[in-house]
């Protein structure tokens, strides 16, 4: 999905949520951008959102007398504005929203408020809960800061969010994400309750714990993320986006 997102940003010369969903659908149905030529290990929330997206395409095509076969290439700006791209049910807060986030802050890092907002939207179109939106906004902000040359200690500052509130506009972070921003992950790891679970709050906390405790070793951090168990590959993928920046 990260490759689909990156491809969309480049092809569209910017953020186009509809085009992103089209490419995610191609991945799901045809293996687009997959190393194996097929989709594998898609999360429940993502799958349901893509099925809903295709259902809405069908309805939209009939309403506006557009051949369904043309819907994936829809480019009319007025029609695109009428299409509701938020295809997730409310309350969906899986870790998949964070897994492929990095292309957004990479593309927009020179404009932090834009990067942060689009980071949130990129997750919310498939994972509709506020926690998913805010987890993506916060993590996107950290990646932006890393790309702008911030030191690790600055990224892990318990007051990072407070010091960069202008990046988040007037939308305050969800209280669970704000707790993470204040360092809730800074504890002894698995024995202290850190888990790489499917809930996005747990996943974000686990990835940041691995980053905080990796002694500046990517290998150590990735192994620590995996060794937390549960959804190991996703935790490591989230960790790697920030650690690799």
Predicted regions and their residues:
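Structured, active/binding-site neighborhoods that engage oxygen-rich ligands
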Residues: 1-245
């Amino acid at each position: 999905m990260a490759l689909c997102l990156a491809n969309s940003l480049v092809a569209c010369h910017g953020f186009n949520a509809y085009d992103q969903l089209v490419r995610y659908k191609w991945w799901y149905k045809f293996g687009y951008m997959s190393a194996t030529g097929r989709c594998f290990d898609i999360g429940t929330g993502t799958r349901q959102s893509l099925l809903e997206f295709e259902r809405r395409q069908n309805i939209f095509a009939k309403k506006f007398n557009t051949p369904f076969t043309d819907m994936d290439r829809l480019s009319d700006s007025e029609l695109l504005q009428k299409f509701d791209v938020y295809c997730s049910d409310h309350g969906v807060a899986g870790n998949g929203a964070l897994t492929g986030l990095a292309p957004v802050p990479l593309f927009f890092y020179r404009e932090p408020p834009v990067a942060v907002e689009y980071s949130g939207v990129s997750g919310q179109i498939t994972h509709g809960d506020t926690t998913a939106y805010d987890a993506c906004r916060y993590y996107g902000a950290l990646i932006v800061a890393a790309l702008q040359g911030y030191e690790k200690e600055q990224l892990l500052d318990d007051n990072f969010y407070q010091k960069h509130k202008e990046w988040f506009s007037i939308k305050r972070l969800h209280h669970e994400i704000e707790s993470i921003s204040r360092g809730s992950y800074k504890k002894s790891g698995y024995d202290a309750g850190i888990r790489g679970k499917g809930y996005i709050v747990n996943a974000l906390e686990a990835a940041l714990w691995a980053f905080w405790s990796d002694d500046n070793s990517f290998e150590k951090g990735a192994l620590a993320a995996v060794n937390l168990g549960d959804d190991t590959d996703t935790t490591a993928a989230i960790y790697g986006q920030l650690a690799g920046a």
